[in-house]
Amino acid sequence: MYDMKALYEAHSVEEAVALRLEHPEAQIIAGGSDVLVQMREGKRAGAELISIYGIDAMRGICIDEDGNIRIGSLTSFSHITRDPIIRKYINVLGEAVDMVGGPQIRNIGTIGGNTCNGVTSADSASTLHAWEAVVELTGKNRSEEHTSELQSLCCI
């Protein structure tokens, strides 16, 4: 069904970064709702994949000590729609991601994948852009973490 060269599974951010450095051509996937469809269509035949689905530290929604709402990039659309923090403070984001596909897609699709995949149907990107979202990026080790405004990384 899927013509892939290899599938690597990361269970920590550090492991994901190490795998990416070791396999620079590999496509990073979380839920895989877009990438796996493209593979099934033959558009990414023979691809290497790095799954970050098992990194629990990248899931969830909370308010940090500075009052910022933090949404892990592996947080599913269905989780975002139901989350009390989102409902109270950014209900429009919950409404936007509730428009994504059907329930199956909302259960597996992630906000990180939706904003990073570069597809025109990125339902969450315009809302995050309007709310001046900031993304956290990391390099080879945690000391290389930095933040960047989403709008500086995307063409919306």
Question: What does each model-identified segment do?
Answer:
Residues 1-148:
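C-terminal structural segment of proteins
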Residues 146-156:
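Positively charged, low-complexity/disordered segments
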